[in-house]
Amino acid sequence: MMKLENFVGMMTGHFDNKDQFNKMQAEGKIYPYAEHVNTICNDKINNLPEDFKGKFVVEESYYEINGKRHASPHLFLITEIEQGILLPSYEIPKGEDKNTFSYDSMKNVDYSKLEKSEKFTPALYHEKDGIWEGGSTSKFSSVMTFKLWEKFSNNFLEVSESMEVNGKRTFGYNEPIIYKRV
C-alpha cells in the first residue's frame, strides 16, 4: 500500500501550467493555459466494501485557449496491483452535470451505483527513481482513439493526451502539458 499512498500523494492537489503557458506565449505559440485539480472523494462514496483499499479521485481539468475556458471532469479509481498502479475510469454518477462535475459539487453516491467506463482502457503506471509513468490507449469507437501518457513526481505532472479520428489528431498538442503544484 506504500506505492498507492506515494502515487496518490503525487497526483492529488491543485496544479497549473502557468510557467509553460507564459513561455509558449513569449515564443508566439498557441498553447492552452491549463489547471488540474485532483481530489480524493472516498468520503462522498457510501457503502464502500469493508476491505476496500482503492482511492476514488475526482479529476477536474480546465483548459483555456483564446479566452475560451473548457472543463473536462473525470472520476477515476486508483488501485495498487502487482504490476504497479492501475487507474480505471468511472462514469460521472447519474444526476451529476457532466460539464460542471467537481469535488465540491459532487453529491454522495452509493458505491453500487458507480459504473466503470467501458470505453476507457485502464491506465497502468510504474515507478522508477521517484517518478511514476504510464498511460493507456483506448478505442472509443471503431474510428476514434484516445491516447494518454503521464509522468508524476513531487514537482510536476506531465500529461500527453490526444484524440484521433480515422488516424487524424483532433485534440492534443505536440508537447505534453507540464503542470506544477500551485
Describe the predicted segments one by one.
Residues D16-V182:
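Soluble ligand-binding/transfer domains with enclosed cavities or grooves
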Residues M1-H14:
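N-terminal helix-cap/turn-to-beta initiation motif at the start of protein domains
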